[in-house]
Amino acid sequence: MRAPMLQKQQAPRMDTPPPEERLEKQNEKLNNQEEETEFKELDGLREALANLRGLSEEERSEKAMLRSRIEEQSQLICILKRRSDEALERCQILELLNAELEEKMMQEAEKLKAQGEYSRKLEERFMTLAANHELMLRFKDEYKSENIKLREENEKLRLENSSLFSQALKDEEAKVLQLTVRCEALTGELETLKERCAQDACQAQAREKELLELQSQQACTHTKETEQLRSQLQTLKQQHQQAVEQIAKAEETHSSLSQELQARLQTVTREKEELLQLSIERGKVLQNKQAEICQLEEKLEIANEDRKHALERFEQEAVAVDSNLRVRELQRKVDGIQKAYDELRLQSEAFKKHSLDLLSKERELNGKLRHLSP
């Protein structure tokens, strides 16, 4: 009985792949996406270089400086966008892992419930055997007392009837022999019942030990899974910190670029025609940036909707098993991941707002340059 039960318990674990393999597959997909974005950025740089080759040397030098700065800004924006997408995808992977762990937890709870019912049945059977054993002991004691009384009466009758009833005495002796034979048979049956009770008790203890070992193994697997989730959460926190540092560096570069642009405005009157052409080109670049920002906003809205759907599904599943401590721990972890994601989203929105402010300032400068031109 125990061997097929263990095979049934181990069967679903062999079918489902471990969460580490899924994380490796997701990381490979992310690396492929990063390589594709890098190739696209290189193509854009090549097109920009081809456009610069058709200009004069002075225009190339100045436009190359501005173009390099604008490309650095666009590269930083692309890097930050790619990092935010990676964080979103890893959050989704963790949510999927949490759902799988909850399903495994439900399966393990059902198995433990079945094992508890089986142990309860064994205990009930053991109690019935113990009650039967006590009844047999009482019957044996009563039979011994009756046998002693009969022997005493037999002795009295034998003494009284030794001289009177020899034939009756022989009959009584035959009855006594029959009773002794019956007593011996009953004692043999009692000994066999005792041995059976002892064997059943040993089997029940062995099964209880096996159940306890299975419970300890399942507890070890649950602790390992929680440690893996904690390590993944720590890596996500580190990546979030790196993204925050990169955003701060990008803001510093933006501030330095704005200072350089203000210094450059003092020499604008000497280079009116060239600056008009530059303003037109920069207007095109700004339109491209606005299109990229709109695409980022659409992707962020889609990711938010997917996250809301996943959270609603997770909450519906968590309501059914809210009494379990494991689900509460997972809920706390998901809340921490959600909080980190909200912070990263707020920082990305602040960075987007800052970039929009810089773009509006550049537009104002372009308008002023157009007014200065004849």
UniProtKB/Swiss-Prot annotation:
Quaternary structure note: Interacts with HEY1.
Which residues, by range, are in coiled-coil regions?
20-351
Entry keywords, A to Z: Coiled coil, Cytoplasm, Nucleus, Phosphoprotein
**Comp. bias regions, Basic and acidic residues:** 19-32
Q: What family is this?
A: Belongs to the CCDC89 family.
Classification via InterPro entries: CCDC89-like
> What organism is the protein native to?
Homo sapiens
Question: What's the domain of life for this entry?
Answer: Eukaryota
Q: What is this protein called?
A: Coiled-coil domain-containing protein 89
Point out the signal peptide segment: none
Q: Which PANTHER family match?
A: COILED-COIL DOMAIN-CONTAINING PROTEIN 89
Q: Which residues carry this modification: Phosphothreonine?
A: 16
Chain segments carrying region Disordered: 1-40
